[in-house]
């Protein structure tokens, strides 16, 4: 239950960071990608990523016991780096202006869930999570 709320809180935090970053980016560069990335998409993607992370974290703890947290952290970090290929290789609609700037907006957002997860860890974990025997 605590892990679920950790994932939910991290998802909300990373969604808020994504929305703020998107608004700043669009204001600074005077571009918009509202047809592709909008608030429901950002909230949904961040919540799904962090809730999936919570499930993965719980699974790693159950299967790997004491090493579960460090293994999960490695998997989550590597997964964030690997997911960067998605916005880089995205095929945008032809009517999108400045398609070359789309990855500059979306690549940093791929790291927001993992950053939020690690940032709020002290609120949800006193020590390492060690499942009961």
Task: Show the residue positions of the predicted features.
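Aromatic-anchored segments of alpha-helical transmembrane domains
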Residues: 15, 77-88
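Generic alpha-helical transmembrane segments
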Residues: 40-54
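Loop-to-transmembrane helix junctions at the membrane interface
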Residues: 53-81
């Amino acid at each position: 239950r605590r892990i679920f709320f950790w994932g939910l809180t991290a998802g909300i935090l990373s969604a808020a960071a994504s929305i703020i970053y998107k608004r700043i980016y669009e204001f600074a560069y005077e571009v918009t990608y509202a047809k592709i990335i909008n608030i429901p998409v950002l909230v949904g993607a961040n919540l799904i990523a962090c809730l999936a992370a919570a499930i993965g974290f719980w699974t790693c703890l159950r299967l790997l016991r004491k090493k579960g947290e460090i293994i999960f952290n490695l998997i989550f970090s590597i997964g964030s780096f690997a997911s960067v290929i998605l916005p880089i290789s995205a095929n945008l609609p032809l009517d999108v202006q400045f398609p070359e700037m789309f990855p500059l907006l979306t690549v940093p957002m791929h790291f927001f869930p993992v950053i939020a997860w690690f940032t709020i860890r002290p609120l949800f974990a006193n020590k390492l999570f060690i499942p009961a025997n």
